[in-house]
């Protein structure tokens, strides 16, 4: 509905932030065709590391902007395809301690689907059913029967452990963190 945007804020995975920031901001600035003969003009674009917006949101919602501005924070964003973390001193990104890896929920879903495939002897790829089961604790129905996924939960845990172990290697002073925010 808007034809002009003064400032468009976009996010990048932490690992790509330094190398893609300028190119993304340039690509987002200017006139864009949005279909049906409509265009939107973006006056300025600002790329931020994906979890950085969560820090600003948290500080704003909890009315802690001034305090967090003086503290060190860790923001963890486990996504579908990437696991991002960001260390911030105040609101500023600490690039050398922030990163992302290609580990996400899609890896968990694929591993569990593969285990179910081996168990039932036929290809199983209902990732939505697996995702729902993980979120609710309710077994997915496979061949009209509730399927107990509990024996496959260690696979999900292994993906999470890999991601967290990698993150811990990057963080220099975990004892100095005042805030840990999970997106």
Question: How would you name each of these model-derived features?
Answer:
Residues 53, 80-81:
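Short, glycine/acidic-enriched loop or turn micro-motifs at the edges of active sites
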Residues 1-73, 92-107, 119, 128-183:
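Nucleotide/phosphate-binding catalytic cleft detector across ATP-hydrolyzing
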Residues 83-87:
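Short beta-strand scaffold segments in enzyme catalytic cores
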Residues 77:
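Conserved catalytic-loop position in the HRD/HxD motif
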Residues 110-118:
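Long, charge-rich alpha-helical interaction segments
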